[in-house]
Amino acid sequence: MELERIVSSALFAFVQTHLPEADLSGLDEVIFSYVLGVLEDLGPSGPSEENFDMEAFIEMMEAYVPGFAHIHRGIIEDMVQTLSVQLSSARNKETLRRPEKLKEESRPPAATGNTQDEAAAAEEEQPGVDVLLEVFPTCSMEQAQWVLAKARGNLEEAVQMLIEGKEEGPPGWGGPNQDLPRRLRGPRKEELKSFILQKYMMVDRAEDQKTHRPMAPKEAPKKLIRYIDNQVVSTKGERFKDVRNPETEEMKATYINLKPARKYRFH
């Protein structure tokens, strides 16, 4: 992760310096892993024609950062040289740290008279005390154990008690809010009350007291009644009436009766 971070920061700085208008969205973990894999085996000596293909590197970077190929080749070589040196030094530091960690892990505990007492106290210590001490740095071990015991092991309730200051604490303790920073103390009742009233109380304005009365129309709409020949269309409630136009005799003469002729049966 540390090596990839070095590669990403170096590439971002290089592209922003020489291509200010370039799109950096193409620089992702894939190209970082590629550059790290290419420069991993170069060492502090840097790239050369035998162990490094500069053309392939530029072509690969051009695919992820359009315009990278227009940068001068010598500038790219200097960047690759500097980056390979940084990676080599970071890799050496990481290699030196590993034996130290192994020594610390394999180192036996110091044989003191209080070792057994400390181990017993650590076993008896509740698991949530560490969390409380991390959240409230100014809180002592005794205070954290007291609040956690009052909360019956419930970590969330213990944190809430410390923030709100509901727990008085053991004798000789002036209260949890005494040692807490201002940002972790609960708001004062007066401040909380004024804040709630200011944000949520009703605003009494003259507009709220007015009763809205819409204006009546100047002229009422007229009732529409349809007449035919000065008579109401219908008084039975029908909405429509079939009105047929009178037909002339000439028009009637053109009609054809398609009714079949009556059949006569003779006995």
Swiss-Prot record:
Cystines in this chain: none
PROSITE patterns, per database record: CUE
Biased composition (Basic and acidic residues): 91-107
Keyword annotations from UniProtKB, A to Z: Cytoplasm, Nucleus, Ubl conjugation pathway
Entry keyword Cytoplasm: yes
This protein's GO CC annotations: cytoplasm; nucleus
Localization: Cytoplasm; Nucleus
Chain segments annotated as transmembrane: none
Location of region: Disordered: 90-125
GO biological process, one term: negative regulation of cytokine production involved in inflammatory response
Any one GO MF annotation of this record: ubiquitin binding
Domain (CUE): residue spans on this chain: 124-167
Subunit structure comment from the entry: Interacts with PGR and ESR1.
Biological role: Controls PGR and ESR1 protein levels through their targeting for ubiquitination and subsequent proteasomal degradation.
Family the UniProt entry places it in: Belongs to the CUEDC2 family.
Domain notes: The CUE domain mediates interaction with PGR and ESR1.
Protein name from the UniProt record: CUE domain-containing protein 2
The species this protein was found in: Rattus norvegicus
